[in-house]
């Protein structure tokens, strides 16, 4: 995990990002006993560290390789016709599917709050996959309908940013 962190900080490495996402997905699916996963974590501190590392470093690496611009009306513009986007499109989908699973299964309010705040930074990259966006909005609505006030506010903030992707610009 420390090697991946160093590689992500120094080089913004997509290879280290893919390994980190594979570990993230494996940890979240570890309760499935019939499926063999590439990574297995038994310590709760390592589990928390892996989740927080993935949530914090994924937006940083994506912003480096595929930066987005915010337009005057608040919408996001992502350069999707680049080679880097085609390489990182599947990891973005994997990230959101794992975050959805995390939001549905995580009982700790602090970790849910971190997951909501960090996943909001990745929402501009969600525009290509409407099914994942729909599932993400459902998970956000689930968090908004239950939980404490700061989680409700974070979920509403994520919903607002997600709605900016799919609403038409206002007429002038």
Regions found by a protein language model. Give the residues of each.
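Active-site-proximal segments of catalytic enzyme domains
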Residues: 150-151
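Internal amphipathic alpha-helical repeat/solenoid segments
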Residues: 2-114, 133-145
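Hydrophobic residues within the alpha-helices of tandem HEAT/HEAT-like
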Residues: 58-62, 115-124, 155-165
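Conserved small/polar residues in nucleotide/adenosyl-binding loops
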Residues: 166-171
């Amino acid at each position: 995990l420390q090697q991946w962190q160093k590689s992500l900080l120094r080089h913004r490495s997509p290879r280290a990002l893919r390994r980190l996402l594979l570990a993230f997905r494996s940890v979240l699916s570890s309760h499935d006993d019939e499926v063999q996963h590439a990574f297995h974590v038994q310590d709760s501190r390592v589990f928390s560290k892996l989740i927080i590392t993935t949530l914090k470093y994924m937006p940083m690496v994506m912003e480096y390789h595929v930066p987005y611009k915010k337009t005057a009306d608040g919408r996001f513009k992502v350069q999707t016709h680049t080679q880097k986007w085609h390489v990182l499109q599947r990891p973005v989908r994997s990230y959101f599917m794992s975050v959805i699973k995390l939001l549905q299964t995580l009982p700790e309010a602090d970790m849910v709050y971190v997951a909501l705040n960090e996943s909001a930074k990745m929402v501009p990259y969600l525009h290509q996959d409407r099914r994942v966006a729909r599932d993400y909005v459902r998970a956000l609505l689930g968090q908004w309908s239950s939980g404490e006030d700061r989680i409700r506010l974070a979920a509403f903030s994520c919903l607002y940013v997600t709605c900016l992707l799919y609403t038409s610009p206002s007429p002038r």
